[in-house]
């Protein structure tokens, strides 16, 4: 299963928060700010162990390949799968049903985001640590050795991500109900109090300060639960009914094993606590945030063993229900696999768009008016600025060697090689003399030095000027927008984009391929800082 997922994720690449660990944390380490490097929160999470993991991989492999990072996330996923298998084995589920659960959760059960994004190694790893802590506490004969092992795992989880909190909290409820106060102190309080102290002194103060809209929280909570249940079951609108039915079925079964009932309670408490915490910390994102696939995975890690156990129990006890149980199992497995395939296709398309932008951006570092803090004009990569990417190359942490097509290079040139300013010092403008070849009409000088009016030959024709490969121009007419096209030697368009002049009438540009052509929305255009030459027929 893990080998298949590794093969499926071969086209993924660094995204979003990956860069926070690769760039931000490495800068803190290089500056000697060890406390900030290790204990500074990522959002509200204490992520010390994932940070150390990313640092080790970065120092060995750099960012030439995403595979070493993704493999670690998949190994954490393997820890979750083996934990689910162990829980079901301890609950006497047959091997066939254990295999169903592994395949079901193996494809993410609607939470495939975690299987394609290496950064989620912390998210998944904390869940794995929590599941194995539950196994030590609630299966087998109680012993101090097992409790200490569980406490260590809880501590590992706290140092990895806050996704361990629901598992620890659910375990605490069970121990408190059993009045096992010594075990509660060992397993929960010993690792939990240092984490709580960190959160109060460091995490809460330095995490992003966001609103917590109380009016949205209840709906966020219910939306998250219903959406998650539907994704896990694979059928819209019945997920909550199926999960609730499984709870009733499992809790109504007479059992002489108190540990079995405790495990069932933990299985169903974890999603409730997960979405209660998410409703408090993420409700500012709106209800769409409740549908994030990563939360589906967090709930599925305990809901799937519960549903598998209920399915096995129903299958064995009620023969007429077997066709329905089999049908629901097939639908759920198919939905999980389909969700993975769909998410993988979208992720691959997304990586195919953003990776060239990040790889080619450093090659446009000397573009006129270039901003060193430029971050590929994509909100998902705010940490990956041009300056930082250049530094990775200079320090041999990155050697981008991908050969991109002319079309791709042209698109990136329009995104990363075009910069606008509202004002510009005349000396700077003169340092970028821009040649101009008329594509249409004629040019006549204006009274303002270095400014020209270009008029097309026909009233219904757009004025067009070939500006070469790099330069700086000022547009005085039109005032709304113009189009920049990148064309090859034959005049074939490679890419084009509209420039909104309300963001600045001064435009600096450079292209990696072809030349830049300025196209007016009408027959007239007035442009400064150019030196028109002969007309190109």
Q: For each predicted feature, which ranges?
A:
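Perimembrane helix-loop-helix junctions
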Residues: 165-192, 196
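Short hydrophobic alpha-helices at membrane interfaces in multi-pass membrane enzymes
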Residues: 135-157, 183-186
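Hydrophobic/aromatic-rich transmembrane helices and adjacent perimembrane loops
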Residues: 115, 123, 287-312
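Transmembrane alpha-helix segments characteristic
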Residues: 100-101, 258-284, 329-332
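Aromatic- and kink-enriched transmembrane "portal" helix at the membrane-lumen/periplasm boundary
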Residues: 66, 99-127
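Intrinsically disordered, polar/acidic, low-complexity terminal segments
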Residues: 1-44, 54, 59-99, 173-175, ...
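Membrane-interface alpha helices of multi-pass inner-membrane proteins
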Residues: 146-162, 167-174
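Transmembrane alpha-helical segments
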Residues: 77-88, 129-141, 152, 168-176, ...
């Amino acid at each position: 299963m893990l080998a298949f997922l590794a093969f499926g994720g071969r086209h993924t690449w660094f995204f979003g928060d990956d860069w926070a660990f690769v760039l931000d944390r490495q800068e803190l380490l290089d500056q000697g700010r060890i406390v900030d490097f290790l204990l500074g929160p990522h959002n509200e999470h204490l992520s010390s162990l994932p940070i150390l993991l990313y640092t080790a991989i970065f120092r060995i492999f750099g960012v030439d390949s995403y595979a070493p990072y993704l493999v670690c996330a998949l190994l954490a996923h393997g820890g979750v799968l083996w934990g689910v298998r162990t829980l079901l084995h301890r609950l006497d589920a047959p091997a066939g049903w254990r295999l169903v659960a592994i395949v079901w959760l193996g494809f993410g059960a609607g939470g495939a985001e975690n299987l394609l994004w290496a950064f989620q190694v912390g998210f998944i790893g904390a869940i794995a640590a929590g599941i194995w802590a539950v196994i030590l506490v609630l299966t087998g004969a109680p012993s101090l050795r097992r409790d200490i092992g569980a406490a260590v795992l809880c501590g590992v989880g706290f140092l990895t991500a806050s996704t361990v909190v629901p598992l620890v909290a659910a375990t605490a409820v069970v121990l408190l109900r059993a009045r096992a106060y010594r075990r509660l102190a060992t397993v929960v309080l010993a690792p939990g109090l240092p984490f709580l102290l960190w959160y109060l002194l460091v995490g809460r103060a330095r995490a992003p300060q966001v609103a917590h809209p109380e009016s949205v929280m209840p709906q966020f909570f219910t939306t998250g639960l219903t959406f998650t249940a539907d994704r896990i079951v694979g059928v819209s609108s019945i997920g909550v009914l199926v999960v609730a039915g499984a709870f009733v079925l499992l809790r109504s079964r007479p059992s002489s094993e108190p540990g079995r009932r405790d495990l069932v309670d933990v299985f169903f408490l974890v999603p409730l606590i997960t979405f209660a915490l998410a409703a408090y910390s993420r409700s500012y994102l709106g209800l769409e945030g409740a549908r994030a696939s990563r939360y589906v995975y967090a709930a599925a890690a305990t809901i799937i063993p519960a549903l598998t156990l209920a399915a096995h129990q129903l299958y064995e006890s009620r023969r007429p229900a077997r066709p329905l149980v089999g049908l629901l199992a097939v639908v759920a497995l198919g939905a999980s696999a389909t969700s993975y395939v769909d998410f993988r296709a979208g992720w691959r398309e997304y990586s195919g768009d953003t990776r060239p932008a990040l790889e080619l951006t450093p090659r446009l570092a000397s573009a006129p008016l270039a901003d060193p803090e430029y971050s590929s004009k994509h909100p998902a990569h705010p940490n990956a600025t041009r300056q930082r990417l250049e530094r990775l190359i200079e320090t041999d942490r990155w050697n981008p060697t991908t050969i991109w097509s002319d079309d791709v290079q042209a698109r990136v040139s329009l995104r990363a090689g075009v910069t606008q300013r509202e004002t510009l010092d005349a000396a700077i403008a003169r340092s970028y003399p821009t040649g101009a070849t008329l594509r249409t009409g004629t040019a006549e000088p204006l009274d303002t030095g270095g400014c020209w009016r270009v008029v097309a030959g026909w009233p219904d024709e757009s004025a067009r000027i070939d500006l070469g490969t790099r330069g700086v121009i000022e547009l005085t007419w039109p005032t709304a927008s113009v189009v920049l096209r990148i064309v090859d030697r034959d005049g074939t368009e490679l890419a084009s984009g509209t420039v909104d002049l309300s963001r600045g009438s001064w435009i600096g540009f450079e292209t990696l391929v072809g030349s830049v052509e300025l196209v007016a929305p009408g027959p007239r255009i007035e442009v400064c800082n150019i030196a028109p030459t002969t007309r190109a027929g």
